[in-house]
From Swiss-Prot:
<feature type="signal peptide">
    <location>
        <begin position="1"/>
        <end position="18"/>
    </location>
</feature>
<keyword id="KW-0964">Secreted</keyword>
<dbReference type="GO" id="GO:0020002">
    <property type="term" value="C:host cell plasma membrane"/>
</dbReference>
<keyword id="KW-1133">Transmembrane helix</keyword>
<keyword id="KW-0165">Cleavage on pair of basic residues</keyword>
<protein>
    <recommendedName>
        <fullName>Extent of cell elongation protein 1</fullName>
    </recommendedName>
</protein>
<keyword id="KW-0472">Membrane</keyword>
<comment type="function">
    <text>Secreted protein cleaved by KEX2 in 8 similar peptides (ECE1-I to ECE1-VIII). Stimulates biofilm formation.</text>
</comment>
<dbReference type="GO" id="GO:0001897">
    <property type="term" value="P:symbiont-mediated cytolysis of host cell"/>
</dbReference>
<dbReference type="GO" id="GO:0090729">
    <property type="term" value="F:toxin activity"/>
</dbReference>
<keyword id="KW-1043">Host membrane</keyword>
<keyword id="KW-1032">Host cell membrane</keyword>
<dbReference type="GO" id="GO:0016020">
    <property type="term" value="C:membrane"/>
</dbReference>
<keyword id="KW-0800">Toxin</keyword>
<keyword id="KW-0732">Signal</keyword>
<feature type="transmembrane region" description="Helical">
    <location>
        <begin position="68"/>
        <end position="92"/>
    </location>
</feature>
<dbReference type="GO" id="GO:0005576">
    <property type="term" value="C:extracellular region"/>
</dbReference>
Length: 282
């Protein structure tokens, strides 16, 4: 498998690894794999999660997020950003990733979305929706609806790709380069939907919002995708792409879903196992 597959998942994998290694309560049972980054002459390697040295009984397989600090996980991920940027930067400078590899990575990520969503659905399957008359029900219901939210987000961007009069890679790059503006427009529309729902006395606002996510994404993204110039396919764009993914991806996810939810995703055993399999097969 091409090196681009490793690069596609490098950020989330490294972040997950750093968070788990730093905050797992049974820290002595984890081998701390090293992630090395060097010049063109050095070997550049990334490692996935290793198996625990001692088997953990299935009855003790409690949710990891209950044994860790959400704030600590987010902090550890942020602390790893300089190293992650250095690793990816060295890979690009060393010529190990070419423009075609970036394109392949885009196609791969799009193709893997259904699988990723199914993994997240399994990871969050144990969450249940709270009663609507409870004070904190909306927040809990949003967390319980996260698999549906993820699916609708994927559907929304799929519609954008179908609608755009451009190739998949250029469309993806246009979305990334304008992601801040798109996210702002989406958030504004989402706020309007919520306010209108409250005004109209809608009982289940969360479900109503989830149903409208694809259309809201299309509405927010289409102006940027259809009017943007076709982005150049060169090394500068590749570097800019990685920079946008690292800097905007994490901050947008935390701003949109909250630090606790993002921490929950990267801390779930199923997600970690999936990433480990992807990297080990590369």
């Amino acid at each position: 498998m091409k090196f681009s597959k490793v690069a596609s998942f490098a950020f989330l994998a490294l972040s997950s690894q750093a968070a788990l290694i730093q905050h797992d309560v049974i820290i002595e049972n984890i081998k701390r794999d090293a992630v090395l980054a060097g010049s063109a002459e050095n070997n550049i390697a990334s490692s996935a999660f290793t198996k625990r040295e001692s088997e953990v009984d299935s009855s003790e397989d409690v949710q990891l997020e209950k044994r860790i600090s959400f704030a600590g996980i987010v902090s550890s991920i942020i602390n790893q950003l300089p190293s992650i940027i250095q690793i990816i930067g060295n890979i690009i400078k060393a010529g190990l990733v070419k423009r075609d590899d970036i394109d392949d990575a885009f196609a791969l990520v799009l193709a893997e979305y259904p699988h990723i969503v199914s993994v997240f659905e399994d990871a969050f399957g144990d969450f249940t929706e709270a009663k609507r008359d409870e004070a904190a029900s909306v927040g809990t219901q949003i967390l319980g609806s996260f698999p549906s939210i993820l699916t609708q987000v994927v559907n929304g961007f799929s519609k954008v790709l179908d609608f755009a009069n451009s190739d998949t890679f250029s469309t993806g790059l246009s979305i990334l380069s304008n992601f801040t503006s798109i996210a702002s427009s989406f958030a504004s529309s989402l706020s309007s939907v919520v306010q209108n729902g409250k005004r109209d006395g809608v009982e289940d606002i969360v479900s109503m919002v989830v149903r409208q996510i694809p259309d809201l994404i299309v509405e927010a993204s289409t102006p940027f995708v259809t009017n943007a110039e076709k982005m150049k396919r060169d090394a500068d764009v590749a570097a800019s792409l990685v920079d946008n993914l690292v800097k905007k991806g994490l901050s947008t996810a935390i701003d949109t879903f909250g630090a606790a939810t993002v921490a929950s995703v990267v801390s779930k055993r199923q997600v970690s196992s999936f990433l480990s399999k992807v990297l080990s097969k590369a």
